[in-house]
Every structure is written in C-alpha cells, then in structure tokens.
Amino acid sequence: MTAQKEDFWGRFAGTFDNDQRYIVGEDTPKAILEELSNEQSLGEVVEFGCGSGFFTRALTNNSKSVVATDLSDEMLEMARHKFQGIQNITFQKANCKSTDFPAEAFDTAVMINLIHVIENPLDSLLECHRILKTGGKLVIASYTAYSMSLLPRIGMIMRFLKKWGKPLPYFNPKLSSDHLSVLLKKAAFVIEESKIIGDKTKALYLRARKE
C-alpha cells in the first residue's frame, strides 16, 4: 500500500503546485501559509508529506532547521530544486508512520495536506509523538470539504477528479475537527487550537502539544 500511495502522488510532481491551486483556489493555500508563517519558535522541525515544498518555505524563517520528508522521490526532487542554497533545510525520504528518527529528536512536527490522504492516520500521530520532545508542537493543516456549502464542495470534487482522478480508497475528503481531535487524544496530544480557515474552499488548521 505504501508503494501505491507513492506512485499515486509522484506522477503529479511536475504539476502539483498548479494543480493544487486549480482544485482549491488561491485563497486557502495563502491562508495556510499565513498561519504557518505566524507560528513562532519552531526549533528543530520535521515536516511529513512535504510534497513539492509548496508550504515548506513558511517553516524555514521561524525554525533552527527543517527536515522535510516525503515518500515520493519525484516530489522530493522538485522540492530540492526549489530550495537550492537554503542552508537550514534538508530533504529525505521517510514514511510518516515509521521513521528512523530517534525518540524526542524534534521540537515541532508539521503535516500539511497529509493526514486526510493516508491510511490509518493514528499511526502517523503516534510516530509524531515518539519523535517529538516533551512539550513539542504538532501543526496539522488539511483541505477539507467539511463545512463547505454544497455547490463549492461539488466543484472542488469535480476539479480534483479532473486533475488527479479517483482518489485512494482511504482518502477522507471531509475530515472534521472532531474526528481529528479524537485521534490526537488517542496519541496523547493536547489540542491548543483548532479552526476552519478559508472562504469558498476550506482547510482544517490545528496546533497540539505532546504531553
């Protein structure tokens, strides 16, 4: 199943940023970037599902270092090309559910548009808990059709299908804050903030701490 996910997203690496803007518009990605830019004192950061690096740059200004990871070699190649010459960021292939990182290695873990497209997302949250220091921060943002009105929701789904085709069977397009909160509590995180951002299209933005 890991190879299936890697192949699904890797084939869109060259057009991913433009595809994303086509599907969800300009405003919601900008809203996520703004929220990320406002996160302070991130310290040593690991990003899971960095993709082409669209959101990664927002992490570099307020952190000591960023390890940006993805399962797709094609996505990582695109991201490395974007960040040539930036000293505090490295890229590597990693599975967010089972990594080689030591326990309590990071101050902050970030997952942008990942939690709703992976199978058994609790496993990834448990791994984040393992590699975060006590009191470490977890930041999650994911596009969601939850709370969207009917016509914009249908439009977003149609644009997704046009660009990327049928999603993987465990894709959760209507991830809610309640559902994610249950998973985070099971993984022993304390939620600090959870909100829906965006206008016509929406994203769930959440910050939690490791107990």
Regions found by a protein language model. Give the residues of each.
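Class I SAM-dependent methyltransferase SAM/SAH-binding core
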Residues: 46-98
